[in-house]
C-alpha cells in the first residue's frame, strides 16, 4: 500500500510508521501546522493536490481531523485515523459520518458513544507500542527493576 501520513506533534508516529514500513508499505509524510482542525483552505488545497498528484491507497493520521476527512471524501481516498486522546473534540463533527473514514479509538466508551450515534466506520483499538524499541531503551531484563518505581518501598508511600 502507498500511505500518505499527516504528521503533527503526536508521540506515536515513529512506531506506527516503522510498523507500516516493516509490513512492506510505502509511506509519504506531510507536515503542516494547523490553525483549525475543521477548516483550513490552504492545507486542504495542499493535501488535495498531493492526493491527486500521487496514487495513495489511504491517508493516515494519529487523531481525527475533519478537514482531512473532507478532502478524502472528495477525492475518494480512504481515511484512517487512530485516536490517542480523549475527549477528542475534533471527532464531534459531521464529517465522522463520511464513508471514507475508518476511525479507530483507544477508548471503548468513546467507541460506544460514536457507534450509538450511528457512526458506522468506527472500531475499538487499544494503543500499541514498538516493544523491540522499548526493550532496547529499557535494557536487559535484569536491569528492568531500575525502571519500576513501585518496587521501591520509599516510592510506595506516595
Task: Show which residues each predicted segment covers.
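Extended catalytic core of nucleotide-activated donor transferases of GT-like folds
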Residues: 9-19, 23, 28-114
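Catalytic core of nucleotide-activated saccharide and alditol-phosphate transferases
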Residues: 80-158
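Extreme N-terminal starter segment of soluble prokaryotic enzymes
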Residues: 1-3
Amino acid at each position: 500500500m502507498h500511505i500518505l501520513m499527516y504528521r503533527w506533534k503526536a508521540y506515536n508516529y515513529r512506531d506506527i510508521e516503522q510498523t507500516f514500513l516493516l509490513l512492506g508499505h510505502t509511506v509519504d509524510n506531510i507536515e503542516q501546522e494547523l490553525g483549525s482542525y475543521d477548516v483550513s483552505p490552504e492545507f486542504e488545497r495542499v493535501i488535495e493536490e498531493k492526493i491527486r498528484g500521487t496514487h495513495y491507497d489511504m491517508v493516515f493520521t494519529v487523531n481525527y481531523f475533519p478537514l482531512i476527512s473532507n478532502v478524502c471524501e472528495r477525492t475518494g481516498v480512504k481515511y484512517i485515523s487512530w485516536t490517542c486522546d480523549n475527549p477528542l473534540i475534533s471527532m464531534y463533527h459531521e464529517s465522522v459520518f463520511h464513508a471514507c473514514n475508518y476511525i479507530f479509538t483507544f477508548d471503548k466508551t468513546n467507541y460506544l458513544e460514536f457507534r450509538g450515534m450511528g457512526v458506522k466506520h468506527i472500531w475499538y483499538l487499544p494503543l500499541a507500542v514498538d516493544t523491540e524499541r522499548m526493550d532496547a531503551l529499557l535494557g536487559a531484563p535484569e536491569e528492568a527493576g531500575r525502571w519500576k518505581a513501585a518496587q521501591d518501598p520509599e516510592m510506595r508511600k506516595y
